[in-house]
């Protein structure tokens, strides 16, 4: 199977200029691995355009250095995200602990309120008994000493 590789390296361009004695050109190297041959297909031009080859418009190439820089920056961004996530996880753990403590405090307060409610009920019952005894005493006093 033939492989097409775009041709736009400046060094290769200068070498091709020396060989062909022509100006600028654009095209493709066609590499045939079956017979280890390299062909050039494209258009040759006698006009010089600042001694630079014409780069195909539709293609974009990234150097290894640019790719590694992108990879490193992406890794650094991921590391930052991981550190923020771990920090947020720790904050969430602290918040859950405080919520659990507050829940225990609320339960203790509920128990205290129940105990106070029972005490108030008991005091109310004793007050009712005292009122009943006072009423009975006033009734007895009225029987002994009728009002005139």
From Swiss-Prot:
It comes from the Bacteria. InterPro entries: DUF16 (IPR002862). Belongs to the UPF0134 family. SUPFAM superfamilies: MPN010-like. This is UPF0134 protein MPN_410. Gene3D superfamilies: 6.10.250.40. It comes from Mycoplasma pneumoniae (strain ATCC 29342 / M129 / Subtype 1).
